[in-house]
Amino acid sequence: EDIVSDYFKDTFADKEVSYKKKAGEYTENNPVYILYADDKKIANVTLTEKKKNAHKFTEWKLASIDFNVDSKTKNTEHSVKITAPKNSEVTINGVKVSSDYITGEADVSLCKHVGDYVTTPVDDVYNINGMFAKPEVKVTYNGKELDTEYVKDGYEAYYPSDDELLSSEKSHILTVAENYGKYMINRGSLSTLSSYMIGNAKEYMSDIPAIDVYLIGRTFTYDITDENVSNFRKYSDDCYSCDVDYNLNVKWSSGSTTYNISLTYVFVKQNDKWMLADFSIR
């Protein structure tokens, strides 16, 4: 009831309400009108005869109101697209969404290069048409409510975190990230860094030049501060992703600079060992 109430408050607030006969459907015996708020179509209103009054004039009563005006035209602002991890439970305004609304699958974009090693994580894509109010979307996965946000073309629910796995892997994640930074300033080796990698990550790393030209010929020291691992997502028992951020501080005799390192990692488990399968620089 609150959803409907809020919808009408938003729809008619500070608007001029008007109506017109609906061409092609209006007749003297079956009046049909289009209701407007300013220039926006809100509803089709159909009247039916209630009775004849003492003067033989017809008194009318409401027969029906159709609020799906927009969904019958090219306006689709009340359609809802939801992307959620496969086998999730999706609810809209507290009502469970049937699997009948699943229109397809989509690979998780971060994990598009892991298929040679593990099963590629996928999302279910839901499309629900004919909504006349902004929905409240909730997604649960294995009993855990997921982070869900509105993106450019609909709602997206993200795979859950796993505190236990993050705790056991955090040191490993930071070791890989620190070795990346050391390699970039020529204080680490490509062979050491590559030993943590497979697949696309290993190929990508081999194409990145080692040292910033700004440091060539300089004698310098360095340290790493403000390390942080965030957006940890577990897709399965053998695949996860995360963001890694830290500052790589470099000092030399006459100055200093700080490199703000921001990476997104995708790890897969191979032979009981977590390997970096893909990464991107943010």
Describe the predicted segments one by one.
Residues 108-145, 152-153:
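Short Pro-Gly-centered beta-turn/loop motif in secreted/extracellular proteins
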Residues 1-16, 87-88, 160-223, 230:
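Core segments of small alpha/beta cavity-forming domains
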Residues 62, 219-225, 276:
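A broad structural signal for short, well-ordered beta-strand segments within beta-sheet-rich domains
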Residues 47-52, 102-105, 152-155:
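A short, sequence-level motif marking secondary-structure junctions
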Residues 55-69, 144-174:
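Extracellular beta-sheet/turn segments enriched in Thr/Pro/Gly and aliphatic residues
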Residues 92-111:
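Short, flexible N-terminal segments of the mature chain
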